[in-house]
Amino acid sequence: MSALAVILVIGLSYLVGSVPTGYLIARHVKGIDIRGHGSGNIGATNVWRTLGPGWGLASLVGDTAKGIVAVLLGRAVGVPGLELLTGAAALTGHGWSVFLRFQGGKIIATSLGVLIMLPPVALATAAAVWIAVLALTRYVSLASIIAASSVPLAFALGGVGWRHVLFGLFLALVAVYKHRANIDRLLKGKESRFSFRK
């Protein structure tokens, strides 16, 4: 497989990740820019709070699908480990979308899609951590930060190889960076708690 094909599939994965699902849903449903409402994020949590649970779930499914597609693109090329690079490219696209002038979401739902396609130890660990932290605190942001941070450790303890550990570190670092405003609000006691009602 040529280097050009590898570069092209990584670029395509970035573009897939860049599709701003929540932004497009909000534009279509209410004609609004979701970045000007609620937390200002384009992700599923803010869509849920702004437009309601149904559209929030639609945003979650769409963003998760981007991660799945990116991994499948990487595997289709047949280069070992390429699915980790295409997965990382999708996360980068979601976080810094070319369609939104390199603004974007916080990568959690797209990370879910990527992890669904990788060895299950990280997904199982991150999901358990996310559910536990959300149940205890009702802070989606805190649950997401801690869950993302558990991914590299889960891969390391699961013995799946150094490439997966490096990918997990990338995922965790980007997730924490994208949640820096949430971290500031958490420290100040100003972060909003999640409710299953709009």
Swiss-Prot record:
Its main location: membrane. The keyword Acetylation does not apply. It holds the Pfam family G3P_acyltransf. This is Glycerol-3-phosphate acyltransferase. The chain crosses the membrane at residues 5-25, 114-134, 154-176. Pathway: Lipid metabolism; phospholipid metabolism. Belongs to the PlsY family. It is found in: Cell membrane. GO terms for molecular function: acyl-phosphate glycerol-3-phosphate acyltransferase activity. One of its GO terms (biological process) is phospholipid biosynthetic process. Keywords: Cell membrane, Lipid biosynthesis, Lipid metabolism, Membrane, Phospholipid biosynthesis, Phospholipid metabolism, Transferase, Transmembrane, Transmembrane helix. GO terms for cellular component: plasma membrane. Its EC number is 2.3.1.275. It is a multi-pass membrane protein. The gene is plsY. It catalyses: an acyl phosphate + sn-glycerol 3-phosphate = a 1-acyl-sn-glycero-3-phosphate + phosphate. Probably interacts with PlsX. Catalyzes the transfer of an acyl group from acyl-phosphate (acyl-PO(4)) to glycerol-3-phosphate (G3P) to form lysophosphatidic acid (LPA). This enzyme utilizes acyl-phosphate as fatty acyl donor, but not acyl-CoA or acyl-ACP.
